[in-house]
C-alpha cells in the first residue's frame, strides 16, 4: 500500500485519537447543549471508525446521542430484525429471507471502503502481490507454504521464505467475509463450487477470529499469517496489505484511488439499493477488486424516524468529510441522490 500509506497512517491515528477522546469525554469542550434524543445501532465493524467519528458532530448538530456496537454485519442484521437496536449496519445486503424477516427495512449505502488481504511475513516487504485464484487456493488449503511457486512467480526478486501459511478468517457473521468470499466466488471456480459467498461460510483452512480487531491481533501474533480485514483496521494496526490483481491484470493496493476507481465502474443499483462492486470489469483501470459499499439498515416505520433521517442525512453529507481519514472513498454523487430518496421515505 505504498502510494499513500504513511499519510493515511498519520491521518487515521489522529482521527481515531480524536474519536476516542470525544467518546470518553462526552461533556468536555462544546458539550453544553443537552442531548435531545438517542439512537442505538450495531453491526459492521468495517464502518465503525466512521460512525465513532460522527458521534460528536451529530450531537452538536442535531442533539442526538449516537451509540454503536461493532458486533459484525451478521449480528447487526439480527439486531435490527429483532428491533433490539434502532438501526443495523452491514457490508452485505439482506438476503430475500432476511429482508422478509426485517419487515419493511431499507438499505442506505452510506460508506465506501475495501477489504484488504493482510499478511505477517518478515522479508516480504510492503508490496506482496497476489491473485484471486492464489488467495482462494490458500484458504482452500491447496497452497500451504509461502515459497510455493504460484506465489514466488508473482513476486520476482523477492526471497520469500519456506514458511508455513496460516490463514485467518472471521469466525463471526461478517460483511468483510461477504465481500471477500463474493470476490473469490467470481474468480475461482473451485471456491464457488466448494465454499461460495456469504457473511458466514465454512472456510476449509485456517483459524477463525472474531471481528476485525480479532483478525488483526491474530495476524500480528502469527508469523506466516494471512487474513482478510477491513483496510482501516489494517492501517490502524500497521499491518502489511497485499496488492491484488484486478480484471485489467493490474496489481492494485486497497487505497483511496483503487476504491474510488471500483466505485466508478458500478452498475445500476439493485431494487433493494445494494450496489455490488467486487471484481469490477477490465475497463475499470486502477480498481481495487475487493471494494465494497456498506449499508445502514433502517425500518421505514421506526418510531425514531426523525432521528434516523437526521443521522442518515448527516452521514451521506457532512459526515463524508471524515472518509479519507479512515481509508474510505467519498460516496459517488449518484449514490447520494439515491440515498436522499430513500431517506425521505422513512417515517
Task: Label the predicted regions.
Residues 2-6, 24-347:
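Flexible loop/hinge segments at secondary-structure junctions
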Residues 6-16:
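Sec-dependent N-terminal signal peptides
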Residues 19-23:
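C-terminal motif of bacterial Sec signal peptides marking the signal peptidase cleavage site
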Amino acid at each position: 500500500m505504498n502510494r499513500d500509506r504513511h499519510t493515511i497512517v498519520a491521518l487515521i491515528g489522529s482521527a481515531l485519537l480524536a474519536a476516542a477522546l470525544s467518546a470518553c469525554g462526552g461533556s468536555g469542550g462544546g458539550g453544553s447543549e443537552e442531548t435531545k434524543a438517542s439512537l442505538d445501532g450495531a453491526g459492521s465493524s468495517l464502518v465503525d471508525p466512521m460512525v465513532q467519528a460522527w458521534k460528536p458532530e451529530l450531537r452538536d448538530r442535531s442533539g442526538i446521542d449516537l451509540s454503536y456496537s461493532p458486533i459484525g454485519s451478521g449480528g447487526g442484521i439480527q439486531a435490527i430484525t429483532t428491533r433490539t437496536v434502532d438501526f443495523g449496519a452491514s457490508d452485505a445486503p439482506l438476503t430475500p429471507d432476511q429482508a422478509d424477516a426485517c419487515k419493511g427495512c431499507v438499505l442506505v449505502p452510506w460508506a465506501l471502503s475495501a477489504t484488504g488481504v493482510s499478511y505477517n511475513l518478515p522479508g516480504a516487504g510492503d508490496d506482496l502481490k497476489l491473485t484471486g485464484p492464489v488467495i482462494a487456493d490458500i484458504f482452500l488449503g491447496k497452497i500451504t507454504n509461502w515459497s510455493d511457486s504460484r506465489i514466488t512467480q508473482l513476486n520476482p526478486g523477492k526471497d520469500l521464505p519456506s514458511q508455513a501459511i496460516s490463514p485467518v478468517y472471521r469466525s463471526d457473521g461478517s460483511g468483510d467475509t461477504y465481500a471477500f468470499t463474493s470476490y473469490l466466488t467470481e474468480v475461482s471456480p473451485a471456491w464457488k463450487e466448494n465454499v461460495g459467498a456469504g457473511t458466514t461460510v465454512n472456510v476449509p483452512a485456517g483459524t477463525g477470529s472474531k471481528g476485525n480487531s480479532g483478525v488483526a491481533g491474530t495476524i500480528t501474533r502469527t508469523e506466516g499469517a494471512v487474513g482478510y480485514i477491513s483496510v482501516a483496521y489494517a492501517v490502524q494496526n500497521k499491518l502489511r496489505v497485499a496488492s491484488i490483481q484486478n480484471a485489467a491484470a493490474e496489481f492494485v493496493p486497497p487505497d483511496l484511488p483503487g476504491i474510488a476507481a471500483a466505485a466508478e465502474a458500478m452498475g445500476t443499483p439493485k431494487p433493494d439499493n445494494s450496489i455490488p462492486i467486487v471484481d469490477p470489469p477490465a475497463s475499470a483501470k486502477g480498481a481495487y477488486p475487493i471494494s465494497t459499499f456498506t449499508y445502514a439498515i433502517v425500518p421505514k416505520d421506526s418510531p425514531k424516524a426523525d432521528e434516523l433521517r437526521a443521522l442518515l442525512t448527516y452521514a451521506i453529507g457532512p459526515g463524508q468529510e471524515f472518509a479519507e481519514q479512515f481509508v474510505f472513498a467519498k460516496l459517488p454523487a449518484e449514490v447520494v441522490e439515491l440515498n436522499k430518496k430513500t431517506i425521505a421515505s422513512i417515517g
